[in-house]
Amino acid sequence: SQFKAMCDEAHKYGVKVVVDAVLNHMGNKSKNDLSPCIPDEIRNNSSLWHDISKNSWYASRHDITQYCMDGIPDLNTSNKTVQNYAIKFLKECVDNGADGFRFDGAKHIETPADSGFGSDFWPTVLQQAMLSQQEALHLSIMVKFLIKQQVTMTKVTVSQSLILIHL
């Protein structure tokens, strides 16, 4: 693949490849604008998406994780099908040479600590995706949300990989 060839070439020069992963939203303003690379089983299953008619304007932690931001199609990251899709994507990146990830819009994905609407997205996706290689280390990441709530999560990641969570 072109991605693998790029990673191989970068590694020849000691350059690490960090993938900008967008795991919670896709497209721009409507489902009609979804990327053609999204499989039909994701695109056409309404249970995998948050209600696009509900917009989040950072009113609450619930709203920024359960509603769409300015009408951008937002995946239901608590759904196991969505989690498996994310795991598959991240594993393919690692298997093809990615050294780490920057997670765009991480604050828009619920955590286990979100009372009443939390999910295991982060622990499940990061652990399963990164354990495709045998070495692992525990990494504690502090995620600070716009509502000034702090949640500490323990992640499992491949040793020598870089995980950045973009807020």
Whereabouts are the PLM-identified features?
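The substrate-binding groove and active-site-proximal loops of carbohydrate-active enzymes
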Residues: 1, 68-83, 99-117
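Broad hydrophobic/π-residue packing in well-ordered secondary structure
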Residues: 1, 48-49, 55, 61-65, ...
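N-terminal structural segment of carbohydrate-active enzymes
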Residues: 1-8, 12-16, 24, 61, ...
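Active-site-adjacent beta->alpha loops and helix N-cap segments on the catalytic face
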Residues: 2-3, 56-64, 69, 115-125
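Active-site-proximal helices and loops of the catalytic beta/alpha 8
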Residues: 7-19, 25, 35-41, 88-167
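Core domains of carbohydrate- and sulfate-ester-processing enzymes
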Residues: 33-72
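Active-site-proximal N-terminal segment of extracellular/periplasmic enzymes that hydrolyze or transfer
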Residues: 30
